[in-house]
């Protein structure tokens, strides 16, 4: 299944369907869920990153339970905006995941999303390092998905 842009994903969604945002990290995959009006992204949770078939099965369960019609994953572009090895690996992973889950997918620039979330948690929430680690993945997914929703709002 090919990757789509955000406008195409929005156009493919059925009535009352949501988007599931993914922020894949080394150990975990942060998850965020849009509302059905595609205006607001909320943190949803995190999955342990492992075998693709196991991750895909869990995402299929979440998609069925929450009415998800498409996936949006973070795209780790280089700081200068170039498409490097990390972006290529993320793209390949997302194409494979989309095929296994059976949902259309798009990717969105995630540069600095984790940094922005960490900064907010340190400055505004005064959280311990351990508590921040528990929250940062799903909050980064929400931050990335919200950026995609805002940039493509109609």
Swiss-Prot record:
GO molecular function: nuclease activity
A GO cellular component annotation in the UniProt record: cytosol
Top-level EC class as recorded in UniProt: hydrolase
EC number of the protein: 3.1.-.-
Keyword Cytoplasm: yes
Classification via InterPro entries: RNaseH-like_sf, YqgF, YqgF/RNaseH-like_dom, YqgF/RNaseH-like_dom_sf
Main localization category: cytoplasm
SMART domains: YqgFc
Alphabetical keyword list: Cytoplasm, Hydrolase, Nuclease, Ribosome biogenesis
Protein's UniProt keywords contain Acyltransferase: no
Location of this chain's protein in the cell: Cytoplasm
GO biological process: rRNA 5'-end processing
NCBIfam families: RNAse_H_YqgF (TIGR00250)
Family of the protein in this entry: Belongs to the YqgF nuclease family.
Function: Could be a nuclease involved in processing of the 5'-end of pre-16S rRNA.
Protein's UniProt name: Putative pre-16S rRNA nuclease
Classification lineage: Bacteria, Pseudomonadati, Pseudomonadota, Alphaproteobacteria, Acetobacterales
